[in-house]
Every structure is written in structure tokens, then in C-alpha cells.
A protein has these predicted regions:
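Enriched for short, Lys/Arg-rich terminal
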Residues: 1, 9-12, 19-24, 59-68, ...
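Generic recognition of well-ordered alpha-helical segments
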Residues: 12, 29-32
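A structural signal for well-ordered alpha-helical scaffolds and beta->alpha junctions
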Residues: 23-27, 42
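Short, intrinsically disordered/low-complexity patches at protein termini
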Residues: 29, 50, 93-94
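Conserved catalytic core of Hanks-type protein kinase domains
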Residues: 33-34, 85
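A short, surface-exposed loop/turn module that caps and links secondary-structure elements
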Residues: 35-62
Length: 94
């Protein structure tokens, strides 16, 4: 099992998502899947982000159609690092 580590920015963005009515149960469900390294269901549309120096090994998935989780698995140290969460426009200014 991977230890879950939340980036400071993630914590702030997650509080904002909850205030907007996003479900903590949905976040907990996907964190359980990721931390236990289970197969991620297709509905989450998990994919790698552009592989630049800043985003090396960073992935994104859709908790809901416009609620995203950006994360990185650091298997050598057994960590699931939650980097960002929010809408497309929150995260990518779209």
C-alpha cells in the first residue's frame, strides 16, 4: 500500500472543491484505489500529463467530468502524492 501525501496546494484546492459541493466519498474512493494500486476503472479517464521536467510521471484522472485529480506515484518510496485538484479552468485556465 502506498502512503498518501497531500501537497499544500492540494489541501487548499480540496477544501474549495468540498465547498462547491464535490463529494468527499468520491475522492476517498479513488484514493483507496490508487493507494492500494488497484486497477483504475475506465470511467476515471486516467492518463499521463505531458512529460516535461516539471510534470515527469504526473498523471491526471477525472473524479467527475469537471473535477480532476493530479497525482504522482513514487513507488521507490511507496508514496502516492496528491498534487492538485479542481476543475479544468482551475487547473489549466481553460
Amino acid at each position: 500500500m502506498l502512503e498518501i501525501v497531500f501537497a499544500g496546494k492540494f489541501k487548499k484546492e480540496y477544501k474549495r472543491a468540498l465547498k462547491r459541493g464535490c463529494s468527499s466519498a468520491k475522492m476517498e474512493e479513488i484514493l483507496d484505489i490508487l493507494s492500494h494500486e488497484k486497477t483504475i476503472p475506465e470511467k476515471y479517464k486516467d492518463h499521463a500529463l505531458i512529460n516535461t521536467h516539471e510534470l515527469k510521471n504526473v498523471r491526471e484522472l477525472h473524479i467527475e467530468p469537471d473535477w480532476l485529480l493530479i497525482y504522482r506515484k513514487e513507488k521507490q518510496v511507496q508514496i502516492l502524492r496528491c498534487l492538485r485538484t479542481g476543475t479544468h479552468s482551475d487547473l489549466f485556465n481553460k
